[in-house]
């Protein structure tokens, strides 16, 4: 896996199923990826067994990217996270110099944005 690789969905790597939150063969594995700039700020985690869902919506004018963090035991933690963001990847240096995916704020300026969370 290299910086800037484009992942296939739902299986970016053999045996790693993002749609099923699986990292077989990596009992303490984790993976983080980012979208390119989105036109619609909406992402959801859906339980196909009972139709429960956790949905996030946000303004892509302020946070045009989405990070997906899937952790299956790294550092003793287990979680999945949907992370709207104004830069990709997490490292500001990489976002600016390598990926060229970032927003700027004028010195002394403020940017406000929000995320709506819906559980159903």
Briefly describe each language-model feature range:
Residues 5-7, 56, 67, 97, ...:
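Short, low-complexity intrinsically disordered segments
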Residues 69-72, 101-106:
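Short proline/glycine-enriched turn/loop segments at secondary-structure junctions
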Residues 81-82, 87-104:
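A conserved acidic, glycine/proline-rich C-terminal tail/linker
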Residues 1-60:
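Active-site/ligand-binding surface loops and adjacent short beta/alpha elements
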Residues 103-120:
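Short Pro-Gly-centered flexible turn/kink motifs
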Residues 43, 80, 113-115:
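Hydrophobic residues positioned within well-ordered beta-strands of beta-sheet architectures
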Residues 25, 89-92, 112:
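A broad, structure-centric signal for solvent-exposed, well-ordered loop/edge residues
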Residues 47-89:
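Glycine-rich active-site loops that engage anionic ligands at enzyme catalytic sites
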């Amino acid at each position: 896996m290299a910086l800037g690789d484009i992942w296939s969905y739902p299986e970016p790597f053999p045996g790693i199923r993002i749609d099923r939150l699986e990292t077989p063969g990596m009992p303490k594995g984790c993976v983080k990826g980012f979208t390119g700039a989105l036109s619609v700020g909406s992402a959801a985690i859906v339980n196909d067994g009972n139709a429960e869902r956790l949905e996030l919506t946000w303004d892509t004018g302020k946070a045009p990217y989405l990070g997906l963090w899937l952790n299956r035991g790294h550092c003793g933690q287990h979680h999945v996270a949907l992370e709207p963001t104004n830069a990709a990847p997490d490292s500001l240096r990489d976002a600016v110099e390598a990926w060229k995916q970032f927003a700027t704020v004028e010195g002394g300026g403020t940017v406000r944005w929000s995320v709506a969370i819906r559980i159903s």
